[in-house]
Amino acid sequence: RQKLSYSNPIFIKLSPDESTETISLIMEEIRNYNFDGVISSNTTIDKTLLKDSDAQGLAGGLSGKPLYEKSNALLSDLHSLDPNILKIGVGGVFTQEDFAKKINLGASLVQIYTSFIYEGPQIVSKLLQ
């Protein structure tokens, strides 16, 4: 970062499909390279989270509600490994309870996307009421 004269925050988005051991090693590198924070999480390739077995063969990663529990588990692990690093909680946030859960698991910030697409801008006031 110093070589590039770059001062904006740098976050790394992690996969919820990585093992706890791999996440621990990644967190060591995040600290070594002075990343500003982590994002929990990217999409998952775990299609067993889908209720419709026909959809399990589809390509691509899962986001939204199917990602909620896995992203929360990763967020909890990240917070245990480093409670001081900034964490952005992502994945399956549709209700105030979902939002609060991310914060309670250690998220400094919460990102919404799928709920914004499906419910529109009013989701923001719904989450913050």
Describe the residue ranges of each PLM region.
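Glycine/Thr-rich beta-alpha phosphate-binding loop at enzyme active sites
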Residues: 29-85, 123
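Glycine-rich phosphate-binding active-site loops on the catalytic face of alpha/beta enzymes
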Residues: 37-45, 93, 99-126
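Short beta-strand/loop segments at the ligand-binding rim of alpha/beta enzyme cores
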Residues: 2-16, 78-89
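Short amphipathic alpha-helical segments, especially helix-boundary/capping motifs
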Residues: 2-4, 49-55, 102-105
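Glycine- and other small-residue-rich loops at beta-strand/loop junctions that grip anionic moieties
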Residues: 15, 63-67, 88-92, 113-116
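Extended mid-to-C-terminal alpha-helical interaction segments
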Residues: 11-15, 22, 43-51
